[in-house]
Amino acid sequence: MKHTLSVLVQDEAGVLSRISGLFARRGFNIASLAVGPAEQIGVSRITMVVQGDNRTIEQLTKQLYKLVNILNVQDVTNIPSVERELMLIKIQINSQTRTEALEIVRIFRAKIVDIAEDLLIIEVTGDPGKIVAIEQLLTKFGIIEIARTGKILLVRTSKINTEYLKNRVVAYGT
């Protein structure tokens, strides 16, 4: 099972290297990684997605706490949260496919960030499912390049049932 870990670290040289070294020694692949400043000065938030069962992730969390500069580690896999990714995707187009490609961009509320006679660069922001869905739809045009961030997230503080909301959005098409 894929687990999402949110790790707060002191923003100092070598912290990410020590974390990735720990994962490498344990034979773990990091499927997704995003690092950036947190709300406190001198603190960074690392969001990573790793594969493993619950027991293995617990052990990994304990090992992370043993590293210098680790302030907090939280497995947020089953905690309601707001998740986002960003993807830039360059596709081939021509006069016959341009309208269809632009319609897909509109439906997904993506943005055209560059356009030429024979290509589009599209910016898509959303949950991982949205990113995968638009990528699959754009495959038929001929994907030239993709750049995709890792997942970022913040834990929700409200008690709103997000699965219920997702189902309502799909049901009403908004």
Swiss-Prot record:
GO terms for biological process: isoleucine biosynthetic process; L-valine biosynthetic process. Coiled coil: none annotated. It comes from the Eukaryota. Pathway: Amino-acid biosynthesis; L-isoleucine biosynthesis; L-isoleucine from 2-oxobutanoate: step 1/4; Amino-acid biosynthesis; L-valine biosynthesis; L-valine from pyruvate: step 1/4. Its main location: plastid. Pfam families: ACT_AHAS_ss, ALS_ss_C. Keywords: Amino-acid biosynthesis, Branched-chain amino acid biosynthesis, Chloroplast, Plastid, Transferase. Its EC number is 2.2.1.6. Residues 4-78 form the ACT domain. GO terms for molecular function: acetolactate synthase activity; acetolactate synthase regulator activity. Gene3D superfamilies: 3.30.70.260, ACT-like. Chain A, domain 2. The keyword Amino-acid biosynthesis applies. One of its GO terms (cellular component) is cytosol. It catalyses: 2 pyruvate + H(+) = (2S)-2-acetolactate + CO2. It is an enzyme of class 2 (transferase). It is found in: Plastid, Chloroplast. NCBIfam families: acolac_sm, PRK11895.1. Belongs to the acetolactate synthase small subunit family. Dimer of large and small chains. This is Acetolactate synthase small subunit. The lineage of its organism: Eukaryota, Rhodophyta, Bangiophyceae, Bangiales, Bangiaceae. The gene is ilvH.
